Amino acid sequence: MSTDGMSTPLMVLGTSSGAGKSLMSAALCRLLLRRGETPIPFKGQNMSNNAWVDESGGEMAYSQALQAWAAGLKPQCAMNPVLLKPQGDSTSEVIHLGQSVGTARAETYYEQWFRPGWSVIREALKDLQCSYTHGRLVLEGAGSPVEVNLQRRDLTNLRLAQFLRARCLLVADIERGGVFAQIIGTLSLLKPVEKQLIRGLLINRFRGRRELFDEGRDWLEAETGIPVIGVMPWLEELFPPEDSLDLLERRGKKNDAEIEIAVLKLPSLSNFSDLDPLEAEPTVQLRWVEPGTFLGTPDAVIIPGSKQTLRDLNSLNRSGLGSQLQTYAQSGGHVFGICGGMQMLGRTLADPLGLEGVTTTDPSSSMAGLNLLPLDTVFKRSKALKQCQRITQWPDNAKVKGFELHHGNSQLIQGSHESVLPMADDPSLGWVSKNERCGQVAGTYLHGIFENGRWRRLWLNLIRKQKGLADLPTDIPHHEQQREQLLNRLTDVFEEHVNINPLLGT
């Protein structure tokens, strides 16, 4: 593909999943922006349930939204034209250019979806080229670029690199161990024409003094003929991992934590970036709780979003965690549900089309919810996809913004209006029901609710008041300002430890 007028594309590949491609791509975007360029993030195909909704109402992976912010651009679904959202049983929802186009099984995906996917990727590239005629594409690969059984129908790695004649950076995670085998093994599986695209190696998550790796750097450069352009130090995780399996290992204890919030780690957990602003609160300790483990006595519980709401609800009930949560709420505990989490708090959930992992023998029947909010939810094929701005009336007045992303339509049970208050000026956005013993159960469809600084602090102060703690200041900015600071911090470290000139050909 011709990229006339645009600078030569760059591509970040990894020796494995979790090597750090997403954050290195974000850092590269921000560094190029600092140098006066217009970087354009792009990942042809991503598999993730951590999604974002752009201004047009299109779904895309959160990691590409983050890279867009790093590039100083508004996220748009063309930056991630193919999104696969796993939903269990080796199936995924297929999103093309922001819209759902069907469901695919793993064993037949490439047979059925390769050609449509490649067509959509090329269309998205043309759109971006028209929008940013003098920009530079910053491409992110997926997993390893040398999965031999998948290379023939690769949509994300070397096919795209060759198509765009991109200069590639290969990232390896030394924290996992075996970094030399990772790099040499990856390069040995590349064809000569593919290996020529690799212009630099990057060692990620190195602990200790950089000079301790000098011998390793020299050996790699002599063995491969490719420069090691950087050794990135190990950093405390700044942003959520792409894979929810990494969540339990992410964080340690906070010395200054004053309240503990338990977050249910659902089997089909989605949009866990919703919790980032709480993770960034120095006085808040998040504790992830899996089905089958003990809930304990946290100061509050959050049920996050789910890609398979009914299946996850069934998991909570079978494991006993659902009944623990009911007891906790009825004893005065604070419970907050986001999207699918709010739906689980309701009375019933009906999934006549089998969209959310129905586990009953009769798909037309409904499943009992946790019955902590008087809501009935029906899942429909049409999906609510939109950004929105509202004014809340609970816990107090606050301007909030975020996005909706859900199949379910929730309605209050007739006659329950006196016991439940709408959370915002849009009554369908969420509800709150006060417990008899001071705690409150509430839920919302608004993803990103905790990014709103004033609202987040108002909610935390409800919990703090019940513990006899002083209120936190509520006159604080939106989390996007803190995200900017984190991106700048990441890029400062990247700029100090990585020389991108060989990648740029200078």
Swiss-Prot record:
Pathway: Cofactor biosynthesis; adenosylcobalamin biosynthesis. GO terms for biological process: cobalamin biosynthetic process. Signal peptide: none annotated. The active site is at 339 (nucleophile), 447. Keywords: Cobalamin biosynthesis, Glutamine amidotransferase. InterPro entries: Class_I_gatase-like (IPR029062), CobQ/CobB/MinD/ParA_Nub-bd_dom (IPR002586), CobQ_GATase1 (IPR033949), CobQ_synth (IPR004459), GATase_3 (IPR011698), P-loop_NTPase (IPR027417). Residues 258-455 form the GATase cobBQ-type domain. GO terms for molecular function: ABC-type vitamin B12 transporter activity; catalytic activity. It holds the Pfam family CbiA. The keyword Lyase does not apply. Gene3D superfamilies: 3.40.50.880, P-loop containing nucleotide triphosphate hydrolases. Belongs to the CobB/CobQ family. CobQ subfamily. PANTHER family: COBYRIC ACID SYNTHASE, DETHIOBIOTIN SYNTHETASE. Catalyzes amidations at positions B, D, E, and G on adenosylcobyrinic A,C-diamide. NH(2) groups are provided by glutamine, and one molecule of ATP is hydrogenolyzed for each amidation. This is Cobyric acid synthase. It comes from Prochlorococcus marinus (strain MIT 9303). The gene is cobQ.
